[in-house]
Amino acid sequence: MKITIHRGIDQIGGCITEVATSKSRILIDLGQNLPDGEGIVQDKFDNRSAIALLTAGIDAIFYTHYHGDHLGLFHLVPETINQYLGRVAKRVALCKYQRLGYIKGREDISANEINKIEHMLPFGPEQSIEIGDIRVLPYFVSHSAYDAFMFLIEANGKRILHTGDFRGHGYLSKGLLPTIKKLILKQGKIDFLITEGTMLTRLDERVRHENELKREIVELMKQYKNVFVMCSSTDMERLATFHTANKEVIGRPFVCDDFQKSVLEIFTDTAGRKSPLFNFGKPYAFWKENSKLVKWMQDKGFCMLVRATDKFDDYLAFLKPQIDRNETVLIYSMWKEYINPTGKHANKRYLDFIGKFPVIKKIHTSGHASADCLTEVCNLVNPTSGIIPIHSEHSSNFNKLPIKDELKSKIITSSKIINELKVEILIK
C-alpha cells in the first residue's frame, strides 16, 4: 500500500493526495495552486496532458470541499474517471460555475466545467463508498466552505484519516471531536493521519468563534447605518454571522446580488432545514432600477454583501451619492494579507475596491484549525504509524505543536516506508 503526497507539503493549497493498493488507486483533492496578488496562477498541472499523466490508472477522485485550491483542476480530468463531491457542495459549485459562464469569451470553458460538475457523483456524511479494495467514509467538518468533509480510508488492513480543511471555532464545529471519538475511533485505531496545518505559521494567533464576531458586528451596525460587507460568497457560517447580526438591527434589508442570493437559497434549502441559523429568509437582490429597495436602503440603512468586481464598482458608484458618507462602513471579513499592500499575498483588485470606502473595519476569523485544535485532534486520533502534515507553508512546524512526544516522532515530511506502507512525499 502507498500514500503519495503529490502536492501539499510546504505549501498552502494545490492539494493532491493519492492512496493506492496493488488493485486500486484514488486521489483526495485535485487542487489548483493559489493565485498571486495579480490573480495569476502558476501551476504545472493546469493542462490536460499533465492531468492525464497524473491521473493515469486512477479509479476515482474524492473532493473534501469546493474551494479551488482543493477542486480547481476538476475540469481537466478524463471522462472515464469518477469524481465525487458532497451533495450540497456540488450544488454550490454548480451555481458558481454557471455564473462564470456569463463572462464573455468564457462560454466554452464554462460549458465543460458545468458538464464535469453535473456528472460528479454526490455523497453524504458516513456514506460508505467502495473503489475496488479501498473503502472511503466521509465525515462532516466545519470549514469556510459548507458541506466539507474529512475522509476515513480503509484498505489492506490499514486505516487512514485525511482531515481536509477543518476548524474548531465555527457554529458547526461542536461535532468535530465527538465525530472522531464516537464514529471513527470506535471502528478501530488510525494508522496514518493526514492533516491540514494552515495555521502552523501563526501559532500564537488567537482564533475567535463566529459568535464573538457577531457581537462585534452588531455594535458596528448600531454605529453605522450603511454597512457593506466583503466576505466569501460561499462561506455559509460567516454569511450567517452577518445575517443574524443584521436581524438584531431592526428594519434593515439584507441585500446582495442575484448570484449571492442563489447561493443563500441553497444554504437555506439544506442547512436551513436543520437550523434556523442558516435560514436566510428572503434576501433582497439589488439592481439599480429597484427604486423601492433603494428608497428603503436610504431611509433605514442596510447590510449589503459585495465583491471586488466591476458590477459592484458600478453599484457602489450609483449608491454613494445617495447615502451619507459619515454613516457608511465596509466590513472586510477575509484574510488580512489580501489587503496588506506590502505583503506577498496582496490582491490589487481587493485593495482598489476597499479604497472606495470612507471607513474599513476588519472582522474575521480563520476557516482553518488553530494550533490548539490541531493539537487536540492529533492527540485524540493518536495514529499508530504516522502524521503527515499538508496544506502548510512550513510542514516541519508541526513539531512545535504541544502534542505528545511519541507523536512528534511520527511526523512525516519526507519519503519513507513504515509498517509495510510506503509514504512518498513529492517536493514541489
Question: What is the role of each PLM region?
Answer:
Residues 175-182, 208-215, 345-350:
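Charged helix-capping and loop-helix junction motifs
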Residues 12-13, 67-71, 125-127, 146-147, ...:
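Active-site environment of divalent metal-dependent phosphoester hydrolases
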Residues 201-331, 390:
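Hard-cation-handling environments
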Residues 93-146, 156, 268-292:
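Metallo-beta-lactamase
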Residues 7, 27-31, 58-69, 83-86, ...:
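Active-site neighborhood of phospho(di)ester-bond hydrolases with catalytic His/Asp-centered motifs
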Residues 4, 12, 18, 126-186:
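Catalytic core of the metallo-beta-lactamase
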Residues 11-14, 21-63, 75-76, 85, ...:
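Pre-active-site segment of Zn-dependent metallo-hydrolases
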Residues 11, 244, 248, 282-428:
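C-terminal regulatory/interaction regions
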